Amino acid sequence: MSASADQIQECFSIFDKDNDGKVSVEDIGACLRSLGKSPTMADIEALKTEIGAKEFDINTLKSIYKKPNIKTPQEQQKEMLDAFKALDKEGHGTIQGAELRQLLTTLGDYLSTAEVDELFKEISVDSTTGAVSYASLVNTIVSGYPLGGF
């Protein structure tokens, strides 16, 4: 689902607190999320560098919104599920908690140990096997659990 020009303008107006036609570059992630995108922290840092100023205007937001590398939550969910399925050689739909911790703290847009500890409080880990349903994990992350920009 794409945001309309009116929705982008409305979003911009909400973040343009003093009505000067500019929004703080620190709000770029929140703007994109409110428009249905799901930028990672790495995406946000790259956008700040690309913008190269402390503020941006509506045309910059429109241009950034159109970038295909800023995924929607649905695209991000599919990408994460595909990655977990590739690791799941036996097709059980699970990953061991210890392996998950290691992956989340070392790969890609990785999380701190404290962030992983917080995540583990929100997900279900099988007390017998130590396994985590990766579909449930992905749903938790994509549904808005505030991890590293998700």
From Swiss-Prot:
* Residue ranges constituting the EF-hand domain according to the UniProt record: 3-38, 75-110
Q: Which GO terms describe its cellular component?
A: actomyosin; extracellular matrix; myosin II complex
Q: Where does Ca(2+) bind?
A: 16, 18, 20, 22, 27
Which BP terms does GO give this entry?
cell migration; mitotic cytokinesis; myosin filament assembly; sorocarp development
Q: Name one GO molecular function term.
A: microfilament motor activity
Q: Respond yes or no to whether keyword Calcium is given for this record.
A: yes
Q: Which Gene3D superfamilies match?
A: EF-hand
- Partners and quaternary state? Myosin is a hexamer of 2 heavy chains and 4 light chains (two regulatory light chains and two essential light chains).
Q: What is this protein called?
A: Myosin, essential light chain
Per the UniProt record, the source organism is Dictyostelium discoideum (Social amoeba)
Lineage, highest ranks first = Eukaryota, Amoebozoa, Evosea, Eumycetozoa, Dictyostelia
